[in-house]
């Protein structure tokens, strides 16, 4: 009888210990999650949620406007030497609005930089704030991105450099259709569309043209883009599907 009671007490103690361990693990995970996101907000800036139900059409391409400024070489595009994608993508958006500025010049004015030409996401909003332009960093779904494009402005996004890598890259989206996303990218080795919209290596098909020259130099298959756009990782779990909205 006493032996049975002792066994019962032992089981209760073990059960309580297991429960305590589970509680401590859950508490640690929640605390780590909260602290991680507080640090992310401080370092990278807050994100505004922005979601859309659907886009207006199956495809849309931003076109150069009357005030769009080309680079000194006569092209819409310029390429970075090393880092600086935050400045080059920001310069592309400004040139679309009629402001003559190059990527290197812009990057010098991007705040919150690290070594190697890398900038925190809040550097984009800080750059435009210096120019009196309200730019909000957002996180949402692809429909929200489509709806922003349909306002006729290129949209800066944050994507992975490669699907299986954690390196982040700023690029400018200028269009989409049912199969691909179209970008103005400042890394020359990723360019896969020529000035007439014809696909070049490593692309396998032909992109549609838009006037005398296209307003994009890179296409990414839609499903691959969504994987690249998902930048969530252990150190930044909530920072995914990031794009910038100009007011």
Region spans (language model):
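Helix N-cap and loop-to-helix transition residues
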Residues: 102-103, 120, 141, 177, ...
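Active-site-adjacent structural segments surrounding the nucleophilic cysteine of cysteine proteases
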Residues: 9-115, 161-164, 177, 246
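Active-site-adjacent substructure of cysteine-protease-like catalytic cores
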Residues: 134-192
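Noncatalytic regulatory segments and standalone regulatory/sensor domains
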Residues: 21-23, 114, 150, 154, ...
């Amino acid at each position: 009888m006493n032996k049975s009671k002792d066994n019962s007490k032992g089981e209760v103690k073990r059960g309580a210990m297991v429960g305590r361990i589970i509680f401590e693990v859950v508490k640690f995970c929640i605390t780590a999650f909260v602290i991680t996101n507080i640090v992310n907000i401080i370092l990278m800036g807050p994100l505004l949620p922005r979601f859309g139900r659907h886009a207006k059409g199956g495809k849309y391409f931003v076109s150069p406007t009357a005030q769009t400024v080309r680079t000194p070489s006569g092209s819409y595009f310029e390429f970075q030497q090393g880092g600086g994608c935050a400045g080059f993508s920001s310069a592309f958006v400004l040139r679309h609005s009629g402001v003559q500025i190059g990527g290197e010049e812009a990057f010098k004015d991007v705040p919150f930089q690290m070594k190697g030409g890398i900038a925190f996401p809040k550097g984009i909003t800080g750059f435009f704030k210096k120019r009196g332009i309200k730019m909000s960093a957002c996180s949402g779904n692809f429909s929200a991105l489509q709806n922003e494009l349909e306002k006729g402005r290129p949209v800066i996004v944050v994507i992975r450099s490669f699907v299986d890598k954690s390196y982040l890259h700023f690029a400018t989206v200028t269009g989409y259709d049912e199969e691909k996303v179209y970008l103005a990218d400042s890394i020359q080795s990723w360019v896969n569309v020529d000035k007439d919209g014809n696909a070049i290596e490593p692309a396998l098909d032909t992109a549609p043209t838009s006037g005398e020259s296209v307003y994009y130099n890179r296409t990414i298959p839609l499903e691959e883009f969504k994987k690249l756009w998902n930048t969530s990782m252990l150190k930044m779990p909530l920072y995914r599907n990031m794009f910038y909205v100009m007011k």
